[in-house]
């Protein structure tokens, strides 16, 4: 700063030789700085207005022509701009369709914060309230310690002025003695803040996990609902940041409030001892603080929206990374690294642009904030400290003839000045933390919006209420699905039968509808009795796999009725096996009994010898010979495609359900092993519902369900010619 001042002085001296006074130069310099600040603040607003008007103007255009400046830009900039437009379009679409409230300091924020507070602190007497009580006690103790330390420092200066070595040494010992509890309390405040943050996060994580796995929400959120794009990011990063912000804000708001209240009382008492007016100083400080706070609130950027958008773009970047990891083999086969890297760069550039916007907004806001806090408030503090000395009733030294008494009064005034200065520094620090907390509260509003919004979506999807953005523009007038407030209503019913004599599955006028509300089959009515082995055929996209999702309860039923047997103890009604089976984290035993646990296996009295027999049925006994049942491996990479499919069949033989939903589950298995598997399944009394393109499996079924891809279907008994054809091909 001194170097800059010297540089300005030299320029001013040169200007004086040309007829400009130093005062005029300083005035011009300050005016230029204020003008630059005004331009910097107003330009983003003007750009925002122009962008909004241009979007409205171009909304009706359909030709999609590019401006000359866009044509002349580089390909990378053009693609980045297109990605930005797509992102803005998606956000506008979500606002228009879902009536979303923008994150900010509003009633919705208070409502969401209250909801999350009830989750973090579920009752009056719990672990979290205990932490809060101890934390609050430490904060109050720290305030009293600050006041006591300020008084000790004032006494130290007093005895230095008096040259009283004995009293100085005594007060200095007290000062060193108070340092031990003061440092302990400071450390405890940080420790309790961390513990409080972890406790809040644990409560939120447990509650959100409970919702996430309720009624298969983990599937519904990503496949049936379109409001949450990256649930994993919200469940991990957003909850963590929200919990940290709440715990930190409690300290940032509570401690300054205690400081201001107690320090204000201490200053008023000191002014009273100096026989000065105790109202003028506090009134002046309150007025200055209120005025500066109002100005900062007016010019404060919308940090809540900015932070929420930053978290959204960061979550999308993580999503791109995870997608590349998941599909690494396919990308490598296609040689699509250039496309993936380009998408990754675009996602990262969007995040960088948003972070740069936040940095730019913070630059000028923090500059103005520091001007008020460091200089305006410091000047006000100087006036507050000087008023009791200048306006006190006994301020003149010349009226007192006794030199000793005069020196005593000088030392007392010095003590007051030192104590008041230290207290004012603490008070200014408290006010600065309160003002800085406003930005943190606005940022907290963004994370509150995301976390509370996630839980609201979880609760709605658990009740069967879904919202897909692509549904809003089409399929709302199909006459089959009823919509309410832009959301499809599942009016169909699932009826569970407890009659042991009625173990059939029946669909009565049930439409096959995709998550986007596309009608695949308008009405499907059929009855599948035990022993009716059903073969399902038809072209791609005709509704074969969709039927399995409806039977399994993954997709909602928008009309009609689905009658299924109620699962009894240890005997599931249906067991679905996809073409690409899922291999869980665990041992070989865990792969066979999934989704059972070892405790479930022991309760069913199933031994390892029975598991070996099951592996032998699917020709996987060599795996048990190579590895024990307790060895934990990455089975997804160890097993081949055919071995994974046979492992899924082993799960079927372990659980022995009434009905097996087989979706191309043996496409990578040899024909002889496949035939053996189907024979064993029928011998166990499992009714087979099979989707396959292999005619060799026809002979294991009694009925056929044919879809034509146009919404029509036919359910009939398989004739002898079709059975003979299957036997001939096998």
From Swiss-Prot:
- Look up the record and report any one GO term of the cellular component aspect: peroxisomal membrane
Q: Indicate yes or no for the key word Nucleotide-binding.
A: yes
InterPro entries, alphabetized: AAA+_ATPase (IPR003593), ABC1_TM_dom (IPR011527), ABC1_TM_sf (IPR036640), ABC_transporter-like_ATP-bd (IPR003439), ABC_transporter-like_CS (IPR017871), ABC_transporter_sub-D (IPR050835), P-loop_NTPase (IPR027417)
* Residue stretches spanning the membrane: 24-44, 137-157, 169-189, 276-296
Phenotype when the gene is knocked out? RNAi-mediated knockdown survives to adulthood, but suffer from neurodegeneration including age-dependent retinal disorganization with retinal holes and pigment cell loss. RNAi-mediated knockdown in the neurons results in a similar phenotype. Effects are probably due to elevated levels of very long chain fatty acids (VLCFAs). In contrast, glial-specific RNAi-mediated knockdown results in no defect.
Q: Its domain of life?
A: Eukaryota
Q: What does this protein do?
A: Plays a role in the transport of free very-long-chain fatty acids (VLCFAs) as well as their CoA-esters across the peroxisomal membrane by acting as an ATP-specific binding subunit releasing ADP after ATP hydrolysis. Thus, plays a role in regulation of VLCFAs and energy metabolism namely, in the degradation and biosynthesis of fatty acids by beta-oxidation, mitochondrial function and microsomal fatty acid elongation.
- Could you tell me what this protein is called? ATP-binding cassette sub-family D member 1
């Amino acid at each position: 700063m001194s170097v800059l001042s010297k540089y300005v002085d030299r320029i001013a001296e040169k200007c004086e030789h040309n007829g400009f006074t130093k005062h005029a130069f300083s005035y011009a310099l300050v005016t230029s700085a204020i003008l630059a600040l005004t331009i910097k603040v107003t330009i983003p607003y003007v750009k925002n207005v122009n962008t909004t008007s241009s979007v409205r103007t171009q909304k009706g255009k359909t030709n999609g022509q590019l401006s000359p400046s866009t044509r002349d830009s580089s390909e990378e900039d053009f693609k980045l701009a297109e990605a930005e437009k797509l992102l803005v379009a998606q956000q506008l679409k979500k606002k228009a369709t879902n009536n979303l409230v923008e994150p900010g300091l509003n009633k919705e924020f208070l409502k969401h914060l209250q909801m999350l507070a009830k989750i973090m602190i579920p009752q009056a007497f719990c672990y979290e309230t205990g932490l809060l009580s101890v934390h609050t006690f430490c904060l109050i103790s720290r305030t009293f310690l600050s006041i006591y330390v300020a008084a000790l420092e004032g006494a130290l200066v007093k005895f230095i002025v008096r040259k009283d070595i004995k009293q100085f040494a005594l007060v200095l010992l007290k000062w060193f003695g108070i340092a031990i509890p003061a440092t302990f309390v400071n450390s405890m405040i940080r420790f309790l803040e961390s513990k409080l943050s972890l406790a809040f996060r644990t409560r939120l994580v447990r509650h959100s996990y409970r919702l996430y796995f309720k009624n298969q929400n983990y599937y519904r959120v990503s496949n049936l609902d379109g409001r949450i794009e990256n649930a994993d990011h919200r469940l991990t990063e957003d909850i963590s940041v929200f919990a940290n912000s709440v715990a930190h804000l409690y300290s940032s708001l509570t401690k300054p409030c205690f400081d201001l209240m107690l320090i204000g009382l201490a200053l008023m008492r000191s002014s009273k001892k100096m026989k000065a007016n105790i109202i003028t100083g506090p009134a002046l400080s309150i007025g200055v603080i209120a005025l500066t706070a109002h100005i900062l609130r007016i010019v404060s950027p919308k940090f809540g929206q900015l932070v929420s958008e930053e978290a959204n773009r960061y979550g999308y970047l993580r999503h791109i990374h995870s997608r590349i990891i998941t599909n690494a083999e396919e990308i490598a086969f296609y040689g699509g690294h250039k496309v993936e890297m380009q998408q990754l760069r675009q996602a990262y550039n969007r995040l960088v642009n948003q972070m740069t916007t936040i940095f730019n907004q913070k630059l000028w806001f923090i500059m103005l904030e520091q001007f008020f806090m460091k200089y305006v408030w410091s000047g006000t503090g100087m006036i507050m400290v000087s008023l009791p000395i200048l306006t006190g009733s006994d301020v003149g030294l010349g009226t007192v003839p006794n030199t000793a008494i005069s020196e005593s009064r000088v030392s007392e005034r010095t003590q007051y000045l030192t104590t008041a200065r230290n207290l004012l520094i603490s008070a200014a620090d408290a006010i600065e933390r309160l003002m800085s907390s406003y930005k943190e509260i606005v940022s907290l509003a963004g994370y509150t919006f995301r976390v509370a919004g996630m839980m609201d979506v979880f609760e709605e999807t658990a009740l069967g209420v879904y919202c897909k953005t692509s549904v809003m523009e089409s399929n709302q007038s199909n006459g089959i699905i009823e919509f309410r407030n832009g959301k499809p209503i599942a009016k169909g019913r699932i009826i569970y039968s407890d009659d042991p004599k009625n173990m059939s599955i029946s669909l009565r006028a049930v439409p096959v509808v995709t998550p986007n509300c596309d009608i695949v089959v308008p009405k499907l009515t059929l009855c599948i009795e035990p022993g009716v082995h059903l073969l399902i055929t038809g072209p791609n996209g005709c509704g074969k796999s969709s039927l399995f999702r409806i039977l399994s309860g993954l997709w909602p039923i928008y009309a009609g009725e689905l009658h299924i047997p109620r699962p009894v103890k240890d005997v599931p009604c249906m067991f679905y096996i996809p073409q690409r089976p899922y291999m869980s984290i665990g041992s070989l035993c865990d792969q066979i009994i999934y989704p059972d646990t070892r405790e479930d296996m022991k309760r069913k009295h199933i031994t390892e010898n029975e598991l070996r027999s099951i592996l032998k049925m699917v020709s996987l006994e060599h795996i048990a010979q190579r590895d024990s049942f307790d060895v934990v491996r990455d089975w997804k990479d160890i097993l081949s495609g055919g071995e994974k499919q046979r492992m899924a069949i082993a799960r079927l033989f372990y659980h022995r359900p009434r009905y097996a939903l087989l979706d191309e589950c043996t496409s990578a298995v040899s024909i002889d092993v496949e035939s053996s598997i189907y024979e064993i399944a029928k011998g166990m009394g499992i009714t087979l519902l099979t989707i396959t393109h292999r005619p060799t499996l026809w002979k294991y079924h009694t009925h056929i369900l044919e879809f034509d891809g146009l919404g029509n279907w036919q359910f009939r008994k398989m004739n002898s010619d079709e059975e003979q054809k299957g036997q001939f091909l096998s």
